């Protein structure tokens, strides 16, 4: 059985998080280390990192806002974060491919959800990528 630990983000996590992000998203969609560092500098407590047996295997992150709907600009502009906002956004839910289908992503969502509830948020919001065959 894996030992699971979830913690909040720190400024010096950017490079490690970028490595996970790169493993989880196509290059055109993956946030860079610089983009992640900018987010961490503004809202580190809205990053949740999951370690399985001491290995960083995934993370979830997103800003807080008074807007119910996630806009593209929010990904690029960390200054849009409003700690007093009503809505916790989810920008990315990342799990390394070799650790998928183990329930780890669900644990990350639950950690963010519980934190949002404790902070009195109205809810959480995200977007998914559209695709067609």
Residue ranges and their predicted role:
Residues 4, 55-59, 88:
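Glycine-rich phosphate/pyrophosphate-binding loop shared by adenosine-nucleotide-utilizing enzymes
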Residues 9, 93-95:
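Hydrophobic adenine-recognition pocket in adenosine-nucleotide-binding enzymes
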Residues 19-33:
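Helix-loop element at the rim of GNAT/NAT acetyltransferase active sites that forms part
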Residues 95, 101-114:
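Conserved acetyl-CoA-binding loop-helix of GNAT-fold acetyltransferases
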Residues 109, 116-129:
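Conserved GNAT acetyl-CoA-binding A-motif
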């Amino acid at each position: 059985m894996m030992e699971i630990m979830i913690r909040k983000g720190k400024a010096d996590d950017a490079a490690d998080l970028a490595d996970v992000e790169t493993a989880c998203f196509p290059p055109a969609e993956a946030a860079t280390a610089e983009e992640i560092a900018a987010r961490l500098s503004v809202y580190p407590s809205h990053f949740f990192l999951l370690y399985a047996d001491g290995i960083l295997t995934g993370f979830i992150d997103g800003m807080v806002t008074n807007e119910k709907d996630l806009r593209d600009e929010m990904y690029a502009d960390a200054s849009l974060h409003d700690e007093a906002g009503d809505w916790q956004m989810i920008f990315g839910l990342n799990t390394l491919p070799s650790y998928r289908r183990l329930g780890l992503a669900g644990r990350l969502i639950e950690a963010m959800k519980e934190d949002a509830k404790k902070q009195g948020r109205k809810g959480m919001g995200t977007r998914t990528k559209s695709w067609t065959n």
